[in-house]
């Protein structure tokens, strides 16, 4: 039997996030699953094999929020390492101000809440 190899645990995983801005506010989702359970974060997730990071950011954000995402630009990268839990992720972060629709909680098995927040008054706990 071949052992299961998991990205982010057995080797560094590649993730993406999309900072969605509208009217001076940032859209955040509250996660239900480890390693960020209970934390607020921008929409995002794993990059699928043979998928570009930009396409993954758009896909994950549309899946998690129900929004239609327009123009997306690269913003920065982040790295999460938790030795105790054996988690290691490198994430590419993108930004957009180009969306249509209103956000809805489309993945209640992964997210417990979604909302717009003033960048000077973000909810806690928040994930980097």
Segments and roles (model prediction):
Residues 78-103:
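Active-site-adjacent beta-strand/loop module that shapes the phosphate/pyrophosphate-binding cleft
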Residues 68-76:
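A short coil-to-beta-strand element that immediately follows conserved catalytic motifs
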Residues 25-63:
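Conserved Nudix-box catalytic region and its N-terminal flanking loop in Nudix hydrolases
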Residues 3-26, 93-95:
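Conserved N-terminal beta-strand and adjoining loop/helix that marks the start
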Residues 93-95, 104-128:
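NUDIX/MutT-family hydrolases
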Residues 1-4, 75-77:
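Short Pro/Gly-enriched beta-strand edge/turn motifs at strand-loop
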Residues 8-12, 39, 84-90, 108-111:
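A generic structural micro-feature
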Residues 23-25, 32, 97-102, 119-121:
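Short loop segments at secondary-structure junctions
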């Amino acid at each position: 039997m071949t052992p299961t190899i998991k990205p982010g645990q057995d080797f560094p995983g590649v993730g993406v996030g999309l900072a969605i801005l509208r009217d001076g506010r940032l859209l955040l989702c509250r996660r239900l699953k480890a390693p960020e359970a209970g934390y607020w974060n921008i929409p995002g997730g794993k990059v699928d094999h043979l998928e570009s990071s930009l396409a993954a950011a758009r896909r994950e954000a549309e899946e998690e929020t129900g929004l239609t995402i327009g123009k997306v630009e690269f913003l920065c990268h982040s790295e999460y390492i938790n030795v105790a839990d054996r988690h290691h992720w490198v994430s590419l972060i993108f930004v957009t101000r180009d969306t249509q629709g209103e956000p809805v909680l489309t993945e209640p098995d992964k997210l417990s809440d979604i909302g717009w927040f003033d960048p000077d008054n973000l909810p806690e706990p928040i994930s980097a």
